[in-house]
Amino acid sequence: PSVQNLTGEDMTKHDALPTRDLQKYVLKHPGIWIIAISSAFIYITKYAITGWGVLFLQKEKGFPIEEATQIIGFYAAAGIVGTVMAGWLSDKVFRSDRVKPTVLAGMLSFITLALFLFTDSGYMMNVVYVSVFSLAIGVLYCIVAGLMAIDIVPRKATGAALGVVGISSYVAAGLQDITSGYLIQFNTTRVDGVDVYDFGPVCWFWLAAALISFILPVLNWKKMRR
């Protein structure tokens, strides 16, 4: 039986389409591509901290490798909490309103990322910054890449929609590594035999991605649902 039969939901005209036609429908849906782009930017910031956070804490903030690794360890743990919270926050607290939790999580991730990147703070404050950022980005990803994507396509097309979003996310994660590595290497100079890092350009790249990741779906949500 279909999901609609099990739940008592009404069938839409798209639900009756063959699978191949539904896949074409998803690929032609501009809303899915907006979500895919937004999700890609989420992955840029998410994997930037995972991949480059230890180096950043060592070279920019002067932490020993042991403490830098511990701080990023808190980042990984907090992301699990954010993922668990996302559905409850959107459906129970905000009553299935996708925009408000997206703005909340997006702003929180943007602010805490900026504080992490641009403030000279100690061990505990950096733990707080990366933990809150990771929690917020976990919520943001689940709402944008999951709930929003599911909301705008027929039930039978959710697999195709999530596939498009997932592929774009992982492609962006790979491109992020290449771009971030280039920006870090290009802005590193050698002084008296010691590498001096300038993380400014790559930090602005990460922060811009964090802003676009939630602004894009929020501004286009009404259009995507039509």
Question: Which role fits each region the language model picked out?
Answer:
Residues H29-A86, Y141, G146, L175-S180:
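Extracytoplasmic gate region of multi-pass secondary transporters
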Residues R95, M148-T158:
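Paired intracellular helix-loop junctions of major facilitator superfamily
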Residues M107-S121:
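C-terminal ends and interior cores of transmembrane alpha-helices
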Residues F116-F118, W204-R226:
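Multi-pass alpha-helical transporter architecture, strongest
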